[in-house]
Protein backbone atom coordinates (compact mmCIF):
# COMPACT_ATOMS: atom_id res chain seq x y z
CA UNK A 1 0.00 0.00 0.00
CA UNK A 2 1.20 3.48 -0.92
CA UNK A 3 -0.24 6.41 1.02
CA UNK A 4 -0.33 9.86 -0.56
CA UNK A 5 -1.63 13.07 1.01
CA UNK A 6 -3.22 15.78 -1.12
CA UNK A 7 -2.99 19.21 0.53
CA UNK A 8 -5.86 21.00 -1.13
CA UNK A 9 -5.93 24.80 -1.17
CA UNK A 10 -2.59 25.86 0.36
CA UNK A 11 -2.72 29.67 0.68
CA UNK A 12 0.83 30.98 0.40
CA UNK A 13 2.03 33.06 3.34
CA UNK A 14 -1.09 32.38 5.39
CA UNK A 15 -0.60 28.59 5.40
CA UNK A 16 3.20 28.19 5.17
CA UNK A 17 3.70 26.90 8.68
CA UNK A 18 0.61 24.70 8.94
CA UNK A 19 1.15 23.23 5.46
CA UNK A 20 4.75 22.42 6.37
CA UNK A 21 3.41 20.65 9.47
CA UNK A 22 0.89 18.72 7.34
CA UNK A 23 3.75 17.51 5.12
CA UNK A 24 6.05 16.63 8.02
CA UNK A 25 3.25 14.80 9.82
CA UNK A 26 2.45 12.86 6.65
CA UNK A 27 6.10 11.84 6.33
CA UNK A 28 6.66 10.98 9.98
CA UNK A 29 3.50 8.89 10.30
CA UNK A 30 3.79 6.75 7.20
CA UNK A 31 2.75 8.56 4.03
CA UNK A 32 4.96 8.19 0.97
CA UNK A 33 4.14 11.44 -0.78
CA UNK A 34 2.58 14.87 -0.30
CA UNK A 35 0.88 16.62 -3.19
CA UNK A 36 0.32 20.38 -3.09
CA UNK A 37 -2.06 22.09 -5.50
CA UNK A 38 0.02 25.29 -5.57
CA UNK A 39 3.75 25.85 -5.61
CA UNK A 40 5.50 27.05 -2.47
CA UNK A 41 9.30 26.86 -2.58
CA UNK A 42 9.62 27.64 1.13
CA UNK A 43 7.47 24.68 2.18
CA UNK A 44 8.99 22.37 -0.43
CA UNK A 45 12.56 23.25 0.62
CA UNK A 46 11.73 22.82 4.32
CA UNK A 47 10.31 19.36 3.69
CA UNK A 48 13.21 18.32 1.45
CA UNK A 49 15.73 19.43 4.10
CA UNK A 50 13.99 17.29 6.70
CA UNK A 51 14.02 14.28 4.36
CA UNK A 52 17.71 14.84 3.63
CA UNK A 53 18.62 14.92 7.34
CA UNK A 54 16.08 12.54 8.83
CA UNK A 55 15.93 10.03 5.95
CA UNK A 56 13.28 8.23 4.00
CA UNK A 57 11.99 8.42 0.45
CA UNK A 58 9.21 10.95 1.02
CA UNK A 59 8.20 12.79 -2.13
CA UNK A 60 6.98 16.39 -2.50
CA UNK A 61 4.95 17.01 -5.67
CA UNK A 62 2.97 19.95 -7.06
CA UNK A 63 -0.14 19.03 -9.04
CA UNK A 64 -2.29 21.95 -10.13
CA UNK A 65 -4.98 19.76 -11.71
CA UNK A 66 -6.21 18.10 -8.53
CA UNK A 67 -9.54 16.91 -9.95
CA UNK A 68 -7.79 14.97 -12.69
CA UNK A 69 -5.26 13.63 -10.17
CA UNK A 70 -8.03 12.33 -7.90
CA UNK A 71 -9.88 10.69 -10.80
CA UNK A 72 -6.68 8.99 -12.01
CA UNK A 73 -5.80 7.87 -8.49
CA UNK A 74 -9.21 6.22 -8.08
CA UNK A 75 -8.23 3.73 -10.80
CA UNK A 76 -5.62 2.22 -8.45
CA UNK A 77 -6.77 3.11 -4.98
CA UNK A 78 -9.25 4.69 -2.62
CA UNK A 79 -9.71 8.35 -1.79
CA UNK A 80 -10.25 9.39 1.82
CA UNK A 81 -11.26 12.98 2.60
CA UNK A 82 -10.70 14.10 6.20
CA UNK A 83 -13.53 16.39 7.31
CA UNK A 84 -15.71 17.15 10.33
CA UNK A 85 -18.74 16.09 8.30
CA UNK A 86 -17.90 12.49 7.44
CA UNK A 87 -18.28 9.02 8.87
CA UNK A 88 -16.94 8.50 12.39
CA UNK A 89 -13.30 7.39 12.16
CA UNK A 90 -13.84 4.82 14.92
CA UNK A 91 -16.57 3.12 12.91
CA UNK A 92 -15.12 3.33 9.38
CA UNK A 93 -11.41 2.70 10.04
CA UNK A 94 -11.59 -1.12 10.11
CA UNK A 95 -13.17 -1.08 6.63
CA UNK A 96 -10.56 1.35 5.27
CA UNK A 97 -7.74 -0.70 6.79
CA UNK A 98 -9.11 -3.88 5.19
CA UNK A 99 -9.48 -2.32 1.72
CA UNK A 100 -6.03 -0.72 1.92
CA UNK A 101 -4.36 -4.14 2.03
CA UNK A 102 -4.89 -4.35 -1.74
CA UNK A 103 -5.14 -0.69 -2.71
CA UNK A 104 -3.27 2.58 -2.34
CA UNK A 105 -4.78 5.47 -0.39
CA UNK A 106 -5.02 9.16 -1.24
CA UNK A 107 -5.83 11.22 1.86
CA UNK A 108 -7.25 14.68 1.13
CA UNK A 109 -6.63 17.42 3.68
CA UNK A 110 -8.11 20.84 2.99
CA UNK A 111 -6.65 24.23 3.87
CA UNK A 112 -9.69 26.31 3.08
CA UNK A 113 -13.34 25.51 2.39
CA UNK A 114 -13.25 22.33 0.34
CA UNK A 115 -15.35 22.27 -2.84
CA UNK A 116 -18.44 20.02 -2.75
CA UNK A 117 -16.88 18.03 -5.57
CA UNK A 118 -14.24 16.66 -3.16
CA UNK A 119 -16.98 15.11 -1.02
CA UNK A 120 -18.42 13.52 -4.16
CA UNK A 121 -15.07 12.26 -5.51
CA UNK A 122 -13.99 10.75 -2.20
CA UNK A 123 -14.72 7.09 -1.55
CA UNK A 124 -14.78 7.93 2.15
CA UNK A 125 -15.48 11.23 3.90
CA UNK A 126 -14.06 10.60 7.36
CA UNK A 127 -14.57 12.74 10.44
CA UNK A 128 -11.86 12.82 13.06
CA UNK A 129 -14.01 14.18 15.83
CA UNK A 130 -16.95 16.54 15.57
CA UNK A 131 -15.31 19.69 16.92
CA UNK A 132 -13.14 22.24 15.11
CA UNK A 133 -9.44 21.39 15.26
CA UNK A 134 -6.34 21.29 13.09
CA UNK A 135 -5.95 19.38 9.84
CA UNK A 136 -2.54 18.35 11.21
CA UNK A 137 -4.27 16.63 14.14
CA UNK A 138 -6.80 14.96 11.84
CA UNK A 139 -4.06 13.64 9.56
CA UNK A 140 -1.95 12.41 12.48
CA UNK A 141 -4.85 10.54 14.04
CA UNK A 142 -5.92 9.05 10.71
CA UNK A 143 -2.42 7.81 9.80
CA UNK A 144 -1.78 6.48 13.28
CA UNK A 145 -5.04 4.52 13.18
CA UNK A 146 -4.38 3.32 9.61
CA UNK A 147 -0.95 1.96 10.54
CA UNK A 148 -2.05 0.93 14.05
CA UNK A 149 0.80 2.86 15.70
CA UNK A 150 3.53 0.98 13.81
CA UNK A 151 5.00 4.06 12.12
CA UNK A 152 5.65 6.09 15.27
CA UNK A 153 9.12 4.69 15.96
CA UNK A 154 10.24 3.27 12.64
CA UNK A 155 13.73 3.78 11.27
CA UNK A 156 14.10 5.81 8.10
CA UNK A 157 16.53 4.72 5.41
CA UNK A 158 19.57 7.02 4.93
CA UNK A 159 18.86 9.05 8.07
CA UNK A 160 21.70 11.34 9.15
CA UNK A 161 19.93 12.05 12.45
CA UNK A 162 18.05 9.58 14.63
CA UNK A 163 16.33 10.04 17.96
CA UNK A 164 16.29 7.04 20.28
CA UNK A 165 13.38 7.06 22.73
CA UNK A 166 14.67 7.31 26.29
CA UNK A 167 13.06 8.03 29.64
CA UNK A 168 16.39 9.41 30.92
CA UNK A 169 16.97 12.28 28.48
CA UNK A 170 17.93 13.04 24.91
CA UNK A 171 19.57 10.32 22.85
CA UNK A 172 20.54 11.63 19.42
CA UNK A 173 22.57 9.65 16.91
CA UNK A 174 24.21 11.67 14.14
CA UNK A 175 25.88 10.25 11.08
CA UNK A 176 29.57 11.07 11.15
CA UNK A 177 30.69 13.36 8.36
CA UNK A 178 33.56 12.06 6.21
CA UNK A 179 36.26 14.70 5.94
From Swiss-Prot:
Q: Name the top EC class.
A: transferase
Cite the binding residues for S-adenosyl-L-methionine.
82, 110-114, 128-135
Predominant localisation class: cytoplasm
* GO aspect biological process, one term: tRNA nucleoside ribose methylation
Q: Name one GO molecular function term.
A: tRNA (cytidine(56)-2'-O)-methyltransferase activity
Q: Does Repeat appear among the keywords? A: no
- Which reaction(s) does the protein catalyse, per the Swiss-Prot or TrEMBL entry? cytidine(56) in tRNA + S-adenosyl-L-methionine = 2'-O-methylcytidine(56) in tRNA + S-adenosyl-L-homocysteine + H(+)
What's the short name of a Pfam family annotated to this entry?
Trm56
Question: What is its biological role?
Answer: Specifically catalyzes the AdoMet-dependent 2'-O-ribose methylation of cytidine at position 56 in tRNAs.
Q: Which family does it belong to?
A: Belongs to the aTrm56 family.
Quaternary context: Homodimer.
Query: Would you tell me the protein name for this molecule?
Result: tRNA (cytidine(56)-2'-O)-methyltransferase
Write down the species.
Methanocaldococcus jannaschii (strain ATCC 43067 / DSM 2661 / JAL-1 / JCM 10045 / NBRC 100440)
Amino acid sequence: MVVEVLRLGHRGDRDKRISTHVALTARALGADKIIFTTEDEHVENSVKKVVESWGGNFEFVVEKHWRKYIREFKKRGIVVHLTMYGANINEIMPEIREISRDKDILVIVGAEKVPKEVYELADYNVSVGNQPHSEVAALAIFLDRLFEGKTLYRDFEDAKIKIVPSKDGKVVIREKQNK
